């Protein structure tokens, strides 16, 4: 059975008579790499295989997002490790910085997918 390539399916629906450009498919990786370069590269590979045009990560440091005393506002009931602080949750996933994202960008280039990241502050831009 042929795998469904979401990008081909959606872009194919635009049609030849439609003057609009086909949509860009952006896979949202966020911080789902959990600080693992191997997992980040796997997310890139799977997004490319699935037909995404780009993959988007998130760039931030916990210190710029939340007070150390802020209570968690994510539902942590399904997490293996619960926490009493939003700061600690952000800190758990802020392990990548410019060097790591440069490595991911090179991997994106090698598999033919555009690298994007949402910066959460000036320094992350």
Regions found by a protein language model. Give the residues of each.
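Glycine-rich, proline-tolerant flexible connector loops at the mouths of alpha/beta enzymes
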Residues: 53-95
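Generic structural "secondary-structure junction" signal
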Residues: 6-8, 12, 33, 62, ...
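Active-site glycine- and acidic-residue-rich loops that bind
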Residues: 32-38
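Active-site beta-loop-alpha junctions enriched in small/polar residues
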Residues: 30-32, 58-62, 120-122
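Alpha/beta enzyme core
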Residues: 39-57, 76, 106, 110, ...
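Hydrophobic faces of well-ordered beta-strands that scaffold small-molecule active sites
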Residues: 25-29, 55-57, 115-118
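N-terminal amphipathic alpha-helix/helix-capping segment at the start of soluble metabolic enzymes
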Residues: 1-26, 101
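Active-site beta->alpha loop and helix N-cap motifs at the rims of alpha/beta catalytic domains
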Residues: 80-125
